[in-house]
Regions:
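Active-site phosphate-binding strand-loop segment of PLP-dependent enzymes
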Residues: 141-213
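PLP-dependent enzyme catalytic core of the Aspartate aminotransferase-like
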Residues: 338-342, 351-360, 366-414
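Helix C-cap/helix->beta junction micro-motif
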Residues: 28, 130, 195-196, 313, ...
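N-terminal small-domain helix-loop-helix segment of the aminotransferase-like
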Residues: 3-95, 284, 383-386, 414
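Hydrophobic residues in well-ordered beta-strands that form the structural core
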Residues: 115, 136, 200-202, 362
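PLP-dependent aminotransferase-like
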Residues: 106-170
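Conserved core segment of the aminotransferase class I/II
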Residues: 227-297, 304-310, 405
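Conserved glycine-rich beta-strand-loop-beta hairpin in the small C-terminal domain of fold type I
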Residues: 296-307, 311, 317-336
Length: 414
């Protein structure tokens, strides 16, 4: 039996692998600092879990495009939170934003998928599963791991296959870097995107966890070619509920129809009870606002602590601007690491895990060269329940502090 070559090339997700390694270490009663898996530490607010419990009896198939009251709630929510002007007809709901990303890619018979390196681990495998060419556009520490307009323009102008459609998957705040883009940067990028007719999937799953109030979106500058992807998993702490959505602009209605068709032949619809509960999540702006304020405050505090400690021992790292992640570069230690037989990011993260119990994900999992001594650090190994305790004056994230200390001590002793 011959397996499809794209499926044959597909590997198990690196994030899930590191999570399994962490669990195995913990089962052997060894200390592990789970900085490898970017799952929200915050519990789903009680009002929303009650809505799910009350909807448990809902067993019907819903519209492939999504429950209309949910789509309307999403539109209103993002208008209030981010001043977006959408219509429910242009929203499609799915079982997580991940499957919707794949549905968009699968809608194209042939395309080239552009990814800034580093980017989230699943974008490239999805592009390959859809049968497309995947091209990495490598970024640098000095550019804050961000794609620049001149870089994108230069690549597009020198393409050898200009007839093939371009899809750029663009995530901000970024997983894995924690960095986001300014309005000036997005405006410059939009000029290039329009020039080369690029269809952009703007993955804004972390947008509501931006630490400041000046969050900008590509959609402001390129509404006709920008698909926005988001969902419940990060801001609402409901990753396992698998509820995501996309806004596909009216100018791409033909693509929306195709994506709905792909959805109908794959997951059919998001589960009815989850859609009902999600409607409550998007309708309860009061709950969302207080929850988001507490999350942002705690995440920013932890990010700054981790950044300061790492910088103090010579690690190159930018403080996060949103989300759960830092993307430190350890090139300052390259000579010392080489003496220990460590020359790749994978070797580095394996050594760190074995010698300190700190679980990191190698930069190579995010499209960086294997020789790049980078890693993603997810600073979410703490009790998120505390954000609901109104009596708390000071947040507790001692395990994160301990893990960072272990990593810094290990580096200092190299």
């Amino acid at each position: 039996m011959e397996i499809n070559k794209y499926l044959r090339q597909s590997k198990y997700s690196q994030t899930l692998l590191i999570n399994q390694a962490s669990l195995t270490r913990a089962e052997n009663n060894q200390t592990v600092y789970k900085f490898g898996f970017g799952q929200s530490p915050f519990p789903v607010p009680t009002e929303i879990t009650k809505a799910l419990a009350n909807a448990a009896h809902r067993k019907e198939y819903m519209s492939v495009q999504g429950h209309l009251p949910l789509r309307e709630a999403i539109v209103n929510f993002h208008q209030q939170q981010e001043n977006k002007h959408w219509h429910s007809d242009n929203i499609i709901v799915g079982s997580g934003s991940k499957i919707l990303l794949f549905c968009v890619m699968a809608a194209f018979e042939q395309a080239e998928v552009l990814l800034p390196a580093p980017s989230w681990v699943s974008y490239a495998p999805q592009g390959k599963l859809a049968g497309h060419k995947v091209t990495w556009l490598t970024t640098s520490f000095n550019e804050k791991w961000q794609l620049t307009a001149p870089q994108l323009d230069e690549y597009c102008q020198n393409r050898t296959t200009p007839e093939i459609p371009l899809i750029l998957v663009f995530n901000y705040p970024s997983n894995p870097t924690g960095q986001t883009y300014s309005a000036k940067q997005l405006s410059a990028l939009a000029v290039v995107m329009k020039k080369h007719n690029i269809i952009v999937i703007a993955d804004e799953i972390y947008s509501l966890l931006t630490f400041t109030n000046d969050y900008s979106t590509l959609e402001q500058f390129y509404p006709e070619g920008c698909i926005v992807s988001s969902g419940l998993s990060k801001w609402c702490g409901a990753g396992g509920w698998r509820l995501g959505f996309m806004h596909i602009p009216p100018q791409l209605n033909h693509l929306l129809n195709t994506v709905v068709g792909v959805a109908s032949e794959t997951y059919s619809c998001a589960p009815a009870p989850i859609q009902i509960a999600a409607t409550t999540a998007y309708e309860r702006l009061d709950v969302a606002n207080s929850f988001l304020t507490a999350q942002r405050k705690l995440l920013n505090e932890i990010s700054l602590h981790c950044t300061t400690q790492l910088q103090n021992v010579g690690v190159m790292v930018h403080p996060a601007q949103g989300g759960f992640y830092l993307f430190p570069e350890f090139s300052a230690f390259s000579e010392k690491l080489t003496k220990h037989g460590i020359n790749t990011s994978e070797q580095f993260t394996l050594a760190v895990m074995e010698e300190t119990g700190v679980a990191l994900l190698p930069g190579s999992a995010f499209g960086m060269e294997e020789s790049s001594l980078t890693a993603r650090l997810a600073f979410v190994d703490f009790d998120g329940e505390q954000v609901f305790d109104e009596q708390i004056n000071e947040y507790n994230f001692e395990k994160v502090k301990d893990g960072i200390t272990q990593l810094c001590v290990w580096l200092a002793k190299l």
